[in-house]
């Protein structure tokens, strides 16, 4: 079994402390171990005779799952993500259930599928696309982003003017600095029903533009709860720089990989009357820079876990072929079932893991993406795009 922490003969890092210092964060309990999937699970290095890890890495690289990976004979976080991405591809694109739930561990079944691909010279169908030669839908989203930028450069809202004038360090960009380079990875959050008071639902949509293809997820961009006496934080409209990091890094039982503000934090405004609605009065409030607004997992999607973070639910997603992919059988509802079997199916973070694995595989050495938060009304800026696009996507995501 090849899994996180497995290394080929002679490929264990000479200085494990230095190795983990580069990939873990300062708030985490210092450990010379890999963070596993289940609650409180930490994995030691484990040796495997021969060069099986390197063989798997070479295969994944050739077939489109490990394009920026290093062939080093060590199954680290990037290799494990690429292995899980291959498993999900076989399950969801080839529709071959024999591989089982994607768990990032290569045993007999995964290795047999790897041999099948090698024998038949199969590769991921997304290899036919690049940022320069992209899917038509990818191009449509990029055109929409460009039109949104042009619109707000000439007609900035009061909030966008405040963001541009913000004088301190922040990872939130003023409208004149919004950058939609198609070679970069872009995640678009579409905020819906933000002015509606009361219980916040998982009714928002996320669109991942990556290497010329499009994936769609659902969750929430709005806080559903908050313990802050000043009111819940709402991430502001516009583009923000994010990087890979760790969510809940001070809790070694629950810490897991997530996207965090690139350096100093992102700009928020407070829900001053604490009604969990984003109103004109709130928008007129003071900007704050906040380093804790992460993009993270939200369970299967039963309730809103956000306290201001951007939250991706695990129940399902729409893949690059525009197929709705159901992950509910292996999408954990809570931390307590992560990494365990429920009805004999290994539980992961489901669709959220797909997003993480895609960004891990295709982010290069930067391990980062650009996050653009727009309003549903912004879809109307491009009349040919479809103002009800987010409604349609959300309806598909929440279909029982």
Predicted segments with their positions:
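Short beta-strand-centered segments at strand-helix junctions
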Residues: 306-320
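Cell wall/extracellular polymer interaction/catalysis modules
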Residues: 122-299, 317-320, 325-399
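Conserved beta-strand and immediately adjacent loop positions that scaffold enzyme active sites
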Residues: 56, 102, 204-205, 308
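Glycine-centered small-residue hotspots that permit tight backbone geometry or close packing
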Residues: 5, 38, 46-47, 237-240, ...
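Cell-envelope/ECM-targeting effectors and their regulatory/trafficking segments
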Residues: 1-148
């Amino acid at each position: 079994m090849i899994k996180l922490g497995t290394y080929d003969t002679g490929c264990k890092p000479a200085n494990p402390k230095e190795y983990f210092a580069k990939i873990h964060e300062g708030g985490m309990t210092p450990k010379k171990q890999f963070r596993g999937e289940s609650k409180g699970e930490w994995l030691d290095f484990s040796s495997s005779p021969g060069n099986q890890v390197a063989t798997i890495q070479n295969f994944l690289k050739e077939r489109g799952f490990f394009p920026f990976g290093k062939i080093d004979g060590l199954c680290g976080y990037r290799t494990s993500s690429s292995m899980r991405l291959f498993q999900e591809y076989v399950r969801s694109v080839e529709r071959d259930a024999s591989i089982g739930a994607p768990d990032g561990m290569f045993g007999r079944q995964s290795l047999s599928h790897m041999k099948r691909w090698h024998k038949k010279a199969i590769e991921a169908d997304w290899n036919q696309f690049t940022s320069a030669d992209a899917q038509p839908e990818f191009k449509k989203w990029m055109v929409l982003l460009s039109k949104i930028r042009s619109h707000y450069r000439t007609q900035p809202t009061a909030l966008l003017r405040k963001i541009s004038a913000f004088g301190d360090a922040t990872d939130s960009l003023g409208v004149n600095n919004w950058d939609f380079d198609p070679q970069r990875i872009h995640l678009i959050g579409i905020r819906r029903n933000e002015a509606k008071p009361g219980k916040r639902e998982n009714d928002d949509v996320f669109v991942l533009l990556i290497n010329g293809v499009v994936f769609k997820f659902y969750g929430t961009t709005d806080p559903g709860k908050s313990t802050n006496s000043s009111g819940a934080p709402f991430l502001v409209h516009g583009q923000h720089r994010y990087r890979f990091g760790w969510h809940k890094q001070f809790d070694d039982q629950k810490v897991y990989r997530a996207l965090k503000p690139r350096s100093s934090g992102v700009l928020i405004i407070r829900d001053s009357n604490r009604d969990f609605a984003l109103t004109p009065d709130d928008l007129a409030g003071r900007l704050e820079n906040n380093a804790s607004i992460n993009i993270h997992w939200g369970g299967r999607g039963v309730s809103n876990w956000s306290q201001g973070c951007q939250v991706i639910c695990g129940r399902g997603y729409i893949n690059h072929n525009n197929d709705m992919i159901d992950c509910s059988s292996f999408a954990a509802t809570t931390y307590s079932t992560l990494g365990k079997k429920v009805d004999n199916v290994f539980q992961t973070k489901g669709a959220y893991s797909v997003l993480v694995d895609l960004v891990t595989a295709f982010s290069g050495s930067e391990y980062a993406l650009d996050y653009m938060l727009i309003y549903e009304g912004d879809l109307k800026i491009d009349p040919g795009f479809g103002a009800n696009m987010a409604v349609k996507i959300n309806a598909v995501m929440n279909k029982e």
